[in-house]
């Protein structure tokens, strides 16, 4: 071997060793575990103060195998740490930076007295945290403050991005808030502090709500909402209790955990320790939507899977997210029926199919990966479904309850409990999905019909194969297709088979689902995308045809039915379209998007027929739904055609007269004086120094609650070095005392 060859060989070995070391470091075992958070936060006393002042006390335990004398805490880079104490003694610290994908965390690095394995440490951190612009993760304003875990507002050793799971621990949280604001977190409220015995990540929100307590669930809805909002609140409270009872039947009785459901403008879908955030628009809609039901059911399941029992280790997301979704879907099936649950499974399967070809094994996928949630949640739910089917419901949940008894639940522990299924679980968790099931065209042979099957995956598939005859007869056959092999299903019938499908129940994660049927319906797994593509091209006949094809096998899929109705309406098939729109509204659990478009469609039909009062009713419902940008825009345009301009309150007129004047003054301070603190900063920055003309005409006003309104306007504007522009803009105004402040730009169709 010559010198160059030796050098290349050594270099290769070195690079390989560094890569292995780096990979090992990225998946390092945790050294410190939080045993309890004790946090006191003080909110700003003035509108212009953008700082949250905090003292966080962390009780830590060395869970490593040896002594530890170094501690690194992670916190937001916007935190200004002023003091740290170790066991009540002042300590020196250094700061560092930690790159997390495209984001950055701040490191607070401490040298500590040597702490032996299983030893404890008490850390106190004083700091203030600045919020420049409000978001769903962190917000400070006179009407409400919100801090969620992913804003990294509190120090902790293991952040959300830690490969083996973030820190969850019992919490005591006290928030010193100005008078008039209600503080909400999780746990029991005692002596002005929240005491949470379960394992949670710290969070809180403040605001001004009406509280309705139903079935031991506290519903916090915006003040002054309608009677319909109270009906939705009661329905959600009953739903949460039913989900809790259902989950307790599977995973064991829960402690007496206070349940709270909070209407929020931002951050809907978050939950922790029995407190659940839902979109405040839910309470304005005419019925509950499917996503809200899934959010509540999953949040209830996570009380067991993460709060009662901590969930960590490699593949923790498969339990916390995937098993929670599986149980939530089972609850939906118990309440709404199998057809509705199958629609939810179809949506989950479609979401997973979108990322399957860049997937990672579930034991190593990280929250840093942009496909993390579609993978661990949806593929995870499918795996638990297969496992329960293989071993039986009773054995499955007995093993889960047994594994949770010690208050800790890890995927490795569950895999040991289900050791008889090791080949399947090794494939499911440690390999990327490589299965694709294919079905051939039916081949009549004598008095029977044979169907060829293929499995390109690494494990066998036990599947149900179905066939439909020319006279509408449905047949089924059970068979096992070997790994990387072929199989066959035989149907004993003299009738002609016109359609076959493999894995009718869609148990298995696959790289492609469109070839599960013969003849093939579409060339891709997302059937809704196929329909939408034709609709967006204004090929309404093809969109109608594709929608009808999908509805033959999934008649309760409101996503497809709403496209069918819209395609029919676009072709002038008004009677058929009206029937389909109404069918969507009659569904038990449609999406919010479908609710909105069904109302838009019925409003447009009534408008064409001269039924202005009915048209207004439907357009108003679509505006209230506020579920999709296009539906909201269409409903507002339709409403303006069906009605005269509304009577506008003088205070609103005066506000926009002031805003028009401030905009053309090109003085930043004048514009900012009309904005709610922390809101619409980028919009305001776009006006400063560039506005030559700004004229606002108020068209409609929609009262959201006692303190918030949506104002529909027509704008005529001219910015520096640009042509004059005009169009519709929807502004959100919030009342502070007797004055309005601009708190949001919900729509800006100014061209």
Each language-model region and where it sits:
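Amphipathic alpha-helical substructures
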Residues: 365-366, 373-445
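Juxtacatalytic substrate-recognition/specificity segment
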Residues: 56, 173, 210-317, 323, ...
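Beta-strand-rich binding/interaction modules
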Residues: 82-85, 421-425, 437-504
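A surface-exposed beta-strand-loop module
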Residues: 78-143, 485-496
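Acidic/His/Gly-enriched intrinsically disordered linker/tail segments
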Residues: 315-382, 386, 390, 404
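Extended, low-hydrophobicity, Ser/Thr/Pro/Gly-biased non-transmembrane segments
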Residues: 57, 108, 113-116, 120-209
